[in-house]
């Protein structure tokens, strides 16, 4: 790992960085296997893995030879059982090399992340990966803005565009040819059965490789936007960084910025907006501004033209929707978010004259929609489509404690993820559904009625189903007579949540 770090060390020079020699390092494939199991990026050292750093060109030579050999056999053998078996092995070899290629490409961007965090003196950078870290940003910014746009990030229509994008970073021809081989090989294998599917629909076999390709595509699409945003603002941007799903990208392409500065200097006045904010999530993005509706339409036109000119991709205008914040709510990561106005009247008296002053305070609200959650619970067989709790027959063979723990853990996950809701009535309804579904499952197991079963267990069943949030709040606010009342009002954001709730994600 130290050898790789020295090779990709960030300095001011424009040295040539050759990728392909590392494909002949045996520990690269050990790293790919290790990080595929752990789903992390490269902060650890290779010594922790217990692998040696010995070179083995024989491994890669065998893989390449077998791939070419299988290609010839597939051409000569048509529609036979052996052909299907050979195709499976070919995919396995391609997967091995592509995962190693992705490992090598992720390292320089991981180093850029570490360098940027150290330069900005950001401590506890792992908190930036939390999904909940976006909501405090919304609370602080959106209440002062007027318009919001929802953008569906498009995908490039041609694979060569992806190769040209990565050409700015990969400067050796063999690696570019290898990248082109991976993309076209995957595209050809999938085009027969799924011609309409995007190349970015990551398969389980090549998840890391295509996650890296997708992240780099998004990084490139945001690069010009960030440049224009910085140029159009009179105030210096205090912080900027893109935190992606799998790999963290920081930095700019210097020569590309020079070209853009020459091309767009005359049109920058169209985009002068010091109150523009941008958030990306799950292949979508949100653009919020304090400007007028006309200014948002200019940003919309710019994005459409940018996708067409830079990626040669025709994007439908309906991909970008513009709405006013104070009368529009948007679904965001399991929450129904929006800005609500609280009108108030203040009476002011000066000598013998009195005045009535009408004011309104904007407040960012995060609500949990009940209908989608009931739909996801119905899919998981905890209730019917109308929200009536039903038993879980597949869990009836478990012990009583395991059944109670499973239902309790599901609700605690719900409560933990949706702890930032402005109103908790939805969570109380979810608690009722899961608690009664648990009771029905236990009653079904013991061939009893729900009423008789609850009467036999008493309050012990309810105590084991109590949420941890109410217990913690009762310790933090001991003087509050009712912890549930306090939990009904408080919004809590946890910085340890890096995955969306699985049932919420079904919506």
UniProtKB/Swiss-Prot annotation:
Localization per record: Plastid, Chloroplast
Broad class of where this protein is predominantly found: plastid
One GO CC annotation: chloroplast
Protein name: Maturase K
Alphabetic keyword roster: Chloroplast, mRNA processing, Plastid, RNA-binding, tRNA processing
Originating organism: Cananga odorata (Ylang-ylang tree)
Function of the protein: Usually encoded in the trnK tRNA gene intron. Probably assists in splicing its own and other chloroplast group II introns.
InterPro entries xref list: Domain_X, Maturase_MatK, Maturase_MatK_N
Top-rank lineage group of the source organism: Eukaryota
One record GO biological process: tRNA processing
Entry similarity comment: Belongs to the intron maturase 2 family. MatK subfamily.
GO molecular function terms attached to this record: RNA binding
């Amino acid at each position: 790992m130290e050898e790789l770090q020295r090779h990709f060390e960030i300095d001011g020079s424009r040295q040539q960085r050759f990728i392909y020699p590392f494909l002949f390092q045996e520990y690269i494939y050990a790293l790919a296997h290790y990080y595929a199991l752990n789903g992390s990026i490269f902060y650890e050292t290779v010594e922790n893995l217990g692998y040696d750093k010995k070179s083995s060109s024989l491994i890669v030579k065998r893989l390449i030879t077998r791939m070419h050999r299988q290609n010839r056999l597939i051409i000569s053998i048509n529609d036979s059982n052996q052909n299907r078996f050979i195709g499976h092995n070919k995919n396995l070899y391609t997967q091995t090399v592509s995962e190693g290629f992705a490992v090598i490409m992720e390292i320089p961007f991981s180093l850029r992340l570490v360098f940027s965090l150290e330069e900005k003196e950001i401590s506890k950078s792992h908190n930036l990966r939390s999904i909940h870290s976006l909501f405090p940003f919304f609370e602080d910014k959106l209440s002062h803005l007027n318009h919001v746009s929802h953008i569906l990030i498009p995908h490039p229509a041609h694979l060569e565009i992806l190769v040209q994008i990565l050409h700015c970073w990969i400067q050796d021809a063999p690696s570019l040819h290898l990248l082109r081989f991976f993309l076209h090989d995957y595209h050809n294998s999938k085009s027969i059965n799924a011609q309409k599917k995007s190349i970015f629909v990551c398969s389980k076999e090549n998840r890391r490789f295509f996650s890296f390709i997708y992240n780099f595509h998004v990084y490139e699409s945001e690069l010009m936007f960030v440049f224009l945003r910085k140029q159009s603002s009179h105030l210096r941007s205090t912080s900027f960084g893109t935190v992606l799903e799998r790999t963290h990208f920081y930095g700019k392409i210097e020569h590309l910025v020079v070209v853009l500065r020459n091309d767009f200097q005359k049109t920058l006045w169209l985009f002068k907006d010091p109150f523009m904010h941008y958030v990306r999530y799950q292949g979508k993005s949100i653009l919020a501004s304090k400007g007028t509706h006309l200014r948002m339409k200019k940003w919309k036109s710019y994005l459409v033209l940018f996708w067409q000119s830079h990626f040669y991709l025709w994007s439908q205008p309906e991909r970008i929707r513009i709405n006013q914040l104070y009368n529009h709510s948007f679904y965001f990561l399991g929450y129904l978010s929006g800005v609500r106005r609280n009108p108030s009247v203040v009476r002011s008296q000066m000598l013998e004259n009195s005045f009535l002053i009408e004011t309104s305070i904007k407040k960012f609200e995060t609500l949990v929609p009940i209908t989608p959650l009931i739909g996801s619970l119905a899919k998981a067989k905890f209730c019917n489509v109308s929200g009536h709790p039903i038993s879980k027959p597949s869990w009836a063979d478990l012990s009583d404690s395991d059944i109670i723990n499973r239902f309790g853990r599901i609700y605690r996950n719900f409560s933990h993820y949706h702890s930032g809701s402005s109103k908790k009535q939805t969570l109380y309804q979810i608690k009722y559904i899961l608690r009664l579904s648990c009771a029905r499952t236990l009653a079904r197991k013991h061939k009893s009625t729900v009423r008789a079963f609850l009467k036999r267990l008493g309050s012990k069943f309810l105590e084991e189903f109590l949420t941890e949030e109410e217990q913690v709040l009762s310790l933090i606010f001991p003087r509050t007579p009712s912890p549930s009342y306090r939990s009904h009002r408080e919004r809590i954001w946890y910085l340890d949540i890096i995955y969306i709730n699985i049932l919420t994600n079904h919506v």
